[in-house]
Amino acid sequence: MTAAVNDAPALDLEVQYVVAWRAGLPPEAAFRRWVSAALAAGGHTGPAALAVRVVDKAEGRRLNHDYRGRDYPTNVLSFPFEAPPGLDEPLPELGDLVICAPVVEREAREQGKPEADHWAHLVVHGVLHLLGYDHEAAEEAEAMEGLERRILAGLGIADPYRLDEQ
C-alpha cells in the first residue's frame, strides 16, 4: 500500500451531491480535509472508506423519519458500517454521512456562523459518530464536543459551541 500525502492512511471518500444546485456547496477537497482531520484526531489509523451524501430537505426529512422517527429534516445523520458476522479482518468501511444542505445553510445563518465553518463542524461531528463517539450522556457529550473543538481549531475554525452559547 502506498501512503498518501504526509503518510496519512488512505481515504476512499465518495461525495454525492443529490441536490438541484451545487453553487455554494463545499467542494470534495474541503470534505476530504475535514474528514481526514476528524479521522486523525479520532484515533483512526488505518485506511478508511466512507460516503458523504449532500441532500435536499425532502430526502433529509424522509431519512430522519425512517431512521430516527422524527418528521423533519436534520443537519447530519450518521450511518456506521456494520461488518457481517464472522468477518475476521477489519474492513476500511466506516459508513455514510447524510447532510441536509438547506438545514446547514439555515442553521449557519441563524447562528451567525460562516457556512463553510458550519459544514466543517457537521462533517467532523458525523465522522466522530462513525468512529463510535456519542453525546447521549453528559460525560460523552463533553468529551465529543472537546474533541470537535480541537479538530476545528486545527482547521482554523472558531469554537462552534461558544457561538451557540452567546
From Swiss-Prot:
It is found in: Cytoplasm. Keywords: Cytoplasm, Endonuclease, Hydrolase, Metal-binding, Nuclease, Ribosome biogenesis, rRNA processing, Zinc. The keyword Coiled coil does not apply. Zn(2+) binds at residues 125, 129, 135. One of its GO terms (biological process) is rRNA processing. Its main location: cytoplasm. GO terms for molecular function: metalloendopeptidase activity; RNA endonuclease activity; zinc ion binding. Gene3D superfamilies: Metalloproteases ('zincins'), catalytic domain. It comes from the Bacteria. Binds 1 zinc ion. Its cofactor is Zn(2+). Its EC number is 3.1.-.-. GO terms for cellular component: cytoplasm. PANTHER family: ENDORIBONUCLEASE YBEY, CHLOROPLASTIC. Belongs to the endoribonuclease YbeY family. Single strand-specific metallo-endoribonuclease involved in late-stage 70S ribosome quality control and in maturation of the 3' terminus of the 16S rRNA. NCBIfam families: rRNA maturation RNase YbeY. This is Endoribonuclease YbeY. It comes from Alkalilimnicola ehrlichii (strain ATCC BAA-1101 / DSM 17681 / MLHE-1). The gene is ybeY.
